[in-house]
Amino acid sequence: MNNLEFALEMKNKRLASGLSQGELASLIHVSRYSINRFENGKANASRETQNIILRCLNYCICDKPFYLLVDYLSVRFPTTDALEIIRKVLGMKTDYFIHYDYGYYGYKEHYAYGEIKVMASDDEHMGVFLELKGAGSRNMEYVLQAQNRDWYSFLNRCLDCGGVIRRFDLAINDMCGLLDIPTLSEKYKNGGADCRCKNYENVQGGKLSGKNRNLASTLYIGSKASTKYFCLYEKQKEQATKKKHTDIINRFEIRLRDKKAVQAVEELLLTYNPHGLVFYLITDFVEFPDYPLWEIFISHDNLPFEMNPYLSIWNALCNGWKDRSCRQS
């Protein structure tokens, strides 16, 4: 993008956002004089400054820049009766589930409804293990919606039935592209972040084809072996490499295990304030000082806690049949 194209796009988006030049200047920590000169083509903004301005304006004109989802949940129940958990906790008929004579994580068998998996063992210490990965969480939302329930009532039911939360992941979907993952990765690498944990990992994934580079950047903050770490990645680019489309530009995943997962669920059920919980978990762990886009992100005051219910039983049944057929053969 040349400077004239940038100046035109900047002005159009600023006017669409309703921001004055002074308000925009305050958000991104530059002078109003500079904003005026950039907008009128009298000064050339650096590529970094252009990036910050346009990401900020895209955020300001977006109706719903962020929303929150449950992305992973696993719960262990102190019983060997998996069918009872299906009935009492999930509130479902056991006939809806396909039984498999194998399990995961050392479990003897499991029951599945779409991607909702309930694992069972004769060992009382292992108990019954409920696992909802990303697709499983969407399938569970389909069930909850049909039952006129939500995550709050479901999590309460898990605890009422003696469930122990083993893992709880929350995902912030960035719909406007405010989070600049490559820049955050570079700042973290160069000491531009304050973090309780110095462990980090930056991964580039995608396809290289001559000069046509379409790499999705992923930043892990914290140790993957710990009870709390973050995963930030460019979801739209990642999906594009798989020839899939999504409106989600970036995703910020908060991954919690064991004690941290238990504490987060208890806090959520006590306060019914997912916005406060999520931004406390983030700012208590990492900060990017003097970076305006990060300041805008952590100051965001509205984070809808949503459900995106989805279930394709036909695909689930076909996959189950193919899986069992392959194992029998």
Regions found by a protein language model. Give the residues of each.
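Structured, helix-rich domain cores that form ligand/interaction pockets
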Residues: 3-4, 12, 16, 59-326
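Charge-rich, low-complexity segments
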Residues: 26, 46-50, 70-71
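DNA major-groove recognition helix of helix-turn-helix/homeodomain DNA-binding modules
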Residues: 46-62
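Recognition helix of helix-turn-helix/homeodomain-like DNA-binding domains
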Residues: 28-45
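Conserved hydrophobic/aromatic packing and binding residues within compact polymer-binding modules
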Residues: 10, 24-25, 35-38, 315
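Short basic helix-loop element that most often maps to the first helix and adjoining turn
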Residues: 8-23, 27
